[in-house]
Amino acid sequence: WASWCLPCIAEAPHLENLKRQGADIVGVAIRDRPEDVARFLAQHGNPYSRIGRDDLSEVQLAIGSSGVPETFVIDGQGVIRYQHIGDVRASDVPVLLAELEKAR
């Protein structure tokens, strides 16, 4: 995700919903400044248990991400089990929860 990403704003309440339902969401801020990340989180909420920085898009490229926002379900071994391209919408929440359950 990124503070400059408009679809990231749209998905923010749905990520909060996932968090409320028990999802552990780890964010990776793509090409972003810490002060902009802090402002975004203050305005739109913070569903993340942790946030990493990817100033050069190295993580993004390594996992095969095509852009922001993008959501991955990663199992306990670090294997990507599901990839959702684009912003998370209300209709995607049950799908993501099911994929999280399968990845356990």
What spans do the regions from the language model cover?
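Conserved redox-active cysteine motifs that mediate thiol-disulfide chemistry
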Residues: 1-17
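Short alpha-helical
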Residues: 6, 32-36, 58, 88-91
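Conserved segment of the thioredoxin-like fold in thiol-based oxidoreductases
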Residues: 10, 21-56, 68
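Short "lid" loop at the C-terminus of a central beta-strand within the Rossmann-like core
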Residues: 14, 30-32, 86
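Short amphipathic alpha-helical segments and helix-helix/interface helices
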Residues: 15-16, 38-41, 97
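Surface-exposed amphipathic alpha-helices with a cationic face
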Residues: 16-19, 101
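Thiol/disulfide oxidoreductase modules built on the thioredoxin-like
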Residues: 42-47, 54-101
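Extracytoplasmic/periplasmic copper-protein system
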Residues: 104
